[in-house]
């Protein structure tokens, strides 16, 4: 399949090249912006909505009044009267059976959206540019494997077709009938409540036929399922990008294809059929980044690449790792050895001094036969008891004063002795 050529072949009604060529319009090289297409499609689709609302009286067509507090029931308004189950039931509230909904819908909602004209034209240009790329068209599910060329252009004789069988034969000759068979196979019943709202059956989209003049082409193609017919002067983004997704399979008539440059212009010339409109330009004129980066102008400003690879090595502490310290300071090994020898020499000197001092002390006391014990205290003799030191501020237990002698108490004379004495 040929695509994006500067010259596009025009095919006859027999499905063969007629020998005529058409220059590819500049609009097919416009930037493809799916975000703009989706935004415009979403807003324009809202303009087809029909206002709806619930009745203003719904849920309030009863007499109800709150019972107030003190009855151990909710303070919601309750239906008055008696003699029926309805009396005493809650009313009016959105939480009540038979009550109104929360925030009842109104017909004065902002249903429609205004979209900038230039933005709508940008979206159409993007949709047309995407329709010329086989990858995008096939990603939408269109069966174009056997189509000879994209964009597909046919002679203007097709605009004079009045019979559906002529249109079917043309699609079969152009190898586009596989896309119609896909539509037939996709016809099914809608899931959900749309079945009750005149949207019972659904199907996939087929080719979009774009013409310049209607000489009967609408009647010829309109009864084929999936077909959409558009006038080139009234292109619709809702038809060119159904669902807001670019990549619709389009079949053009020759006169409609030639008119695109007049409608949308080129980058050298403004559009003649639209006032003061210029074709949108790419933000990046050359998308070949490797070619741009390797160009001599950019390479001249860049520094030479660093080809040496510096791998990150685990950093070790030289104060704990002798091997790393020796790499930094080879004299560290000699220093460490000298330190060890100096410590050993100092230790030996201290031990000799301690032994000499102990021996001199034992000689002064006249203790014979005892060898000086180096580094340990003398052991106590077995059986020697440690004398207790006198406690300061308290009298010792052995130095108690003897108790004073008590005088003999004189016996008092009894009453009988007193009588006898008298």
From Swiss-Prot:
InterPro entries: Ribos_uL4_C_dom (IPR025755), Ribosomal_uL4 (IPR002136), Ribosomal_uL4_dom_sf (IPR023574), Ribosomal_uL4_euk/arc_CS (IPR013000), Ribosomal_uL4_euk/arch (IPR045240). The modification N6-acetyllysine is found at residues 14, 106, 259, 333, 353, 361. One of its GO terms (biological process) is translation. The modification Omega-N-methylarginine is found at residue 97. There is a cross-link at residues 239, 327 (Glycyl lysine isopeptide (Lys-Gly) (interchain with G-Cter in SUMO2)). The keyword Ribonucleoprotein applies. The modification Citrulline is found at residue 300. The modification Phosphothreonine is found at residue 266. The modification Phosphoserine is found at residues 290, 295, 362. It comes from the Eukaryota. Residues 376-385, 402-422 have a biased composition (Basic and acidic residues). Component of the large ribosomal subunit. May bind IPO9 with low affinity. Interacts with RBM3. PANTHER family: 60S RIBOSOMAL PROTEIN L4. This is Large ribosomal subunit protein uL4. It comes from Bos taurus (Bovine). The gene is RPL4.
């Amino acid at each position: 399949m040929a695509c994006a050529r500067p010259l596009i072949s025009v095919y006859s009604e027999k499905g063969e090249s007629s020998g005529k060529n058409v220059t590819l319009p500049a609009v097919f090289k416009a930037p493809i912006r799916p975000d703009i297409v989706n935004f415009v499609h979403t807003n324009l689709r809202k303009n087809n909505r029909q206002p709806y609302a619930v009745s203003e009286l719904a849920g309030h067509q009863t007499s109800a009044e709150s019972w107030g507090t003190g009855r151990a029931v909710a303070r919601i308004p309750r239906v008055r009267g008696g003699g029926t189950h309805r009396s005493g039931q809650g009313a009016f509230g959105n939480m009540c059976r038979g009550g109104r909904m929360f925030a009842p819908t109104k017909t004065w909602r902002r249903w429609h959206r205004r979209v900038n004209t230039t933005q709508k034209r940008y979206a159409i240009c993007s949709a047309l540019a995407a329709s010329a790329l086989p990858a995008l068209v096939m990603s939408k599910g269109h069966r174009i494997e056997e189509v000879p060329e994209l964009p597909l252009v046919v002679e203007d004789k097709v605009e004079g077709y009045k019979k559906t069988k002529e249109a079917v034969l043309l699609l079969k000759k152009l190898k586009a009938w596989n896309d119609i068979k896909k539509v037939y196979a996709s016809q099914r019943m809608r899931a959900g409540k749309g079945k009750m709202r005149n949207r019972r059956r659904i199907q996939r989209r087929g080719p979009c036929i774009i013409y310049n003049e209607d000489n009967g082409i609408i009647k010829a193609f309109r009864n084929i399922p999936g077909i959409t017919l558009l006038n080139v002067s009234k292109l619709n983004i809702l038809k060119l990008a159904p669902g807001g997704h670019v990549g619709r399979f389009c079949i053009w008539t020759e006169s409609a294809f030639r008119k695109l440059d007049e409608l949308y212009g080129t980058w050298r010339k403004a559009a003649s059929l639209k006032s003061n409109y210029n074709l949108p330009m790419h933000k990046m004129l050359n998308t070949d980044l490797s070619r741009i980066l390797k160009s001599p102008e950019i390479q001249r400003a860049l520094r030479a690449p660093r080809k040496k690879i510096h791998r990150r090595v685990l950093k070790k502490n030289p104060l704990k790792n002798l091997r790393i310290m020796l790499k930094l300071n080879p004299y560290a090994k000699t220093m460490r050895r000298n330190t060890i020898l100096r410590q050993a020499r100092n230790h030996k000197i201290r031990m000799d001094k301690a032994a000499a001092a102990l021996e001199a002390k034992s000689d002064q006391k006249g203790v014979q036969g005892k060898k000086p014990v180096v580094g340990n205290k003398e052991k106590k003799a077995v059986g020697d008891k440690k004398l207790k030191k006198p406690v300061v501020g308290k009298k010792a237990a052995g130095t108690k004063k003897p108790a004073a002698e008590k005088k003999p108490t004189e016996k008092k004379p009894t009453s009988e002795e007193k009588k006898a004495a008298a």
